[in-house]
């Protein structure tokens, strides 16, 4: 070992012999301890074991430092196929105590089919007690897969759904909005949390002084607020007018209490743009059209137009052909709504006109480049 200070050759050799079943790993580890204080090598060797019975697992006998190194490693835990259910629970508890956010999440993903959904729920909530480290390239995938199981099971359980929504929010910098289904439900059902975010991010009407602490908090929550793109009260592609009106009225009342009523039209327009289509095949759905007609303002219109156009995202430049198609599509939509929903139609005419101007601009630019 004098010529192998890192222990790489020793590890490779022992690993080969162990896989062949030639050596007793515990004896090798004791021998290594007697001639070296290489903790990394020791941890590597212990990690070769497939744990079947945790009472006899090699890692159980080690000190706190080795346990922290073992459970903090980005190497998949090796648990024998013969292991009992309690071994997986033991592993979770040990990893929570000694490991990192990433190794705990990785382990939770690996054993999600080995434990009950109730145990998975409980173990997932405990993520909030673990100090987060730098997200790995797989963090978002693990979270999405675990949350998907829990969301499908507990979305209609108000208490558990609220707990999961809190955890989704904690992971907002990793999860995309479409994977934050419990938070979506919370916001769609009631405007209280959304209004709370507004109170943190925006100033009140009385020109309140913003201290450094509130500015930092606003910066922390803004990314999550910006991700929140939803139509209030929408469920399974349907919006009921009475429910939507109740949500809108409560939201307005909350803004008034927060001295932020001036933001009402802008915020509502931003959300209503995410309405499902109507039964007649045109956008937005009938309930949203009725609300727009009732609460229409210039700020609502502007916010709706911006949100709708932002949905397009990145697109190919094709001399204005795509923009011309969009102009015609939105114009047709507006004309279908014009008689019964004039304010809503006005919004769609505005979007249509914007794309018409953009189509003309792109066409001329393409001609100039020839």
Regions found by a protein language model. Give the residues of each.
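Short amphipathic alpha-helical heptad-repeat segments
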Residues: 319-331
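Inter-repeat boundary and helix-capping residues of tandem alpha-helical solenoids
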Residues: 316, 323-324, 341-342
């Amino acid at each position: 070992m004098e010529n192998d200070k890192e222990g790489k050759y020793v590890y490779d050799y022992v690993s080969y012999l162990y896989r062949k079943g030639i050596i007793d790993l515990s004896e090798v580890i004791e021998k290594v301890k007697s001639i070296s204080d290489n903790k990394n090598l020791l941890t590597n060797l212990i990690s070769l074991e497939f744990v079947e019975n945790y009472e006899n697992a090699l890692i159980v006998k080690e000190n706190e430092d080795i346990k922290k190194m073992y459970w903090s490693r980005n190497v998949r835990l090796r648990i024998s196929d013969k292991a009992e259910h309690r071994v997986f629970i033991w592993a979770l508890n040990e990893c929570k105590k000694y490991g990192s956010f990433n190794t705990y999440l990785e382990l939770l993903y690996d054993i999600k089919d080995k434990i009950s959904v109730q145990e998975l729920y409980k173990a997932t909530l405990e993520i909030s007690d673990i100090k987060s480290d730098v997200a790995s390239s797989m963090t978002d995938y693990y979270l999405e897969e675990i949350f998907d199981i829990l969301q499908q099971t507990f979305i209609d359980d108000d208490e558990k759904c609220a707990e999961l929504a809190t955890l989704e929010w904690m992971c907002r910098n990793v999860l995309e909005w479409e994977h934050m289904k419990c938070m979506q439900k919370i916001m769609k059902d009631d405007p209280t949390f959304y209004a709370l975010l507004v109170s943190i991010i925006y100033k009140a009407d009385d020109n309140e002084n913003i201290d450094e602490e509130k500015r930092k908090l606003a910066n922390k929550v803004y990314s999550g607020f910006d991700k929140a793109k939803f139509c209030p009260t929408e469920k399974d592609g349907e919006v009921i007018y009475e429910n939507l009106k109740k949500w809108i009225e409560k939201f307005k009342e909350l803004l008034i209490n927060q001295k932020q009523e001036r933001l009402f039209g802008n915020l509502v327009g931003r959300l209503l743009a995410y309405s499902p289509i109507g039964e007649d095949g045109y956008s937005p759905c009938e309930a949203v059209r009725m609300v727009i007609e009732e609460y229409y303002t210039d700020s609502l219109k502007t916010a709706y137009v911006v949100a709708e156009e932002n949905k397009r995202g990145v697109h190919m430049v094709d001399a204005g052909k795509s923009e011309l198609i969009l102009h015609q599509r939105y114009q047709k939509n507006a004309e279908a709504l014009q008689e019964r929903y004039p304010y809503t139609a006005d919004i769609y005419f505005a979007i249509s006109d914007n794309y018409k101007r953009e189509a003309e601009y792109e066409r001329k630019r393409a001609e100039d480049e020839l």
